[in-house]
């Protein structure tokens, strides 16, 4: 199922001609360092194969940082035991772009400030306890320019072919 496996998502995106960062799927915590050596790309991020909101996403500048994390009590395994190692593509302005689709049609693109980490759910800005004026001045999430037409069409076609309604 594409909706619960990032590995399958990346494979299908690549098969459809949509480029994704270099990614390796690793089964088991004990295999991560060796897989990272073979991938040999830094900086890199780790992420859970099955998770959302940026859970499990960590950035590493070098092998020493990765090894310290993997061998520490802070390491969190994905529910399926698969950790993804992925080349980190640093956004020029420090903001990650995420596009949302409903019924296989483009809805909007949001620009997200990732300087505080990768747990990036826009709904988190609406947590109880925040006052409305705090939300008004938040720069963390901003609706931004839409995808270029060619890229939007490629994603819409991918979603249609994969029969995914919401992405």
Regions found by a protein language model. Name each.
Residues 58-158, 162:
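Phosphate-binding site of ATP-dependent enzymes
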Residues 2-95, 152:
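Active-site nucleotide/adenylate-binding loops and adjacent lid/helix of ATP-dependent enzymes
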């Amino acid at each position: 199922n594409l909706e619960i496996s990032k590995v399958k998502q990346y494979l299908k995106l690549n098969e459809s001609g949509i480029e994704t960062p270099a990614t390796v799927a690793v089964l088991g915590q004990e295999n991560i360092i060796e897989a990272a050596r073979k991938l040999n790309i830094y900086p890199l991020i780790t992420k859970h194969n099955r998770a959302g909101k940026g859970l499990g996403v960590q950035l590493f500048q070098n092998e020493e940082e990765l090894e310290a994390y993997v061998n520490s009590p802070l390491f969190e395994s994905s529910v399926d035991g698969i950790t993804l190692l992925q080349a980190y593509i640093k956004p020029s302005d420090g903001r990650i772009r995420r596009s949302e689709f409903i019924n296989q049609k483009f809805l909007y693109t949001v620009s997200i400030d990732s300087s505080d980490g990768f747990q990036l759910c826009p709904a988190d800005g609406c947590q109880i306890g925040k006052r409305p004026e705090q939300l008004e001045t938040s720069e963390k999430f901003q609706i931004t320019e839409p995808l270029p037409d060619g890229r939007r069409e490629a994603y819409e076609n991918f979603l249609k072919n994969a029969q995914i309604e919401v992405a």
